């Protein structure tokens, strides 16, 4: 699959991730693996993570920040908000087999204020949070 098609599939995935789990999960192979290293969770088989996402107890919003990759490995940087709360930063590392995702690792974190002691080395432009 060409890079433009993969990018379009990833955009579609996040556009529907908060509203339609059937469409959002079209991107995965049936035997796909989803991991959250921060919580130590691993889900094997798309049906397992699609089902808990259907009943997720918070209203989610996603904002795509950047998608980059080539070949079978892609990285997506997103922002996510739970129930209209503060935005968290996410990084997803996605491995493709053919035209579908076979493995995804998601890292989620909150932004933090830059420490003053690093200021003299820091570029003065601001990275969007």
Model regions and ranges:
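A solvent-exposed, acidic/Ser-Thr-rich amphipathic alpha-helical stretch
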Residues: 4-8, 21-72
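Alpha-helix C-capping/helix-to-loop hinge sites
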Residues: 13, 34-35, 77
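Short, low-complexity N-terminal intrinsically disordered segments enriched in polar/charged residues
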Residues: 1-26, 30, 121-129
């Amino acid at each position: 699959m060409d890079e433009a098609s993969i990018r379009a599939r990833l955009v579609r995935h996040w556009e529907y991730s908060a509203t339609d789990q059937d469409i959002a999960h079209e991107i995965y192979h049936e035997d796909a693996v989803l991991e959250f290293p921060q919580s130590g969770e691993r889900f094997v088989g798309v049906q397992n993570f699609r089902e808990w996402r259907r009943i997720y107890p918070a209203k989610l919003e996603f904002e795509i920040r950047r998608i980059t990759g080539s070949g079978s490995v892609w990285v997506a940087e997103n922002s996510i908000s739970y129930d209209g709360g503060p935005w968290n930063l996410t990084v997803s590392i996605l491995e493709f087999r053919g035209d579908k995702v076979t493995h995804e690792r998601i890292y989620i974190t909150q932004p933090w204020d830059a420490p003053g002691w690093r200021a003299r080395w820091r570029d003065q432009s601001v990275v969007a949070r």
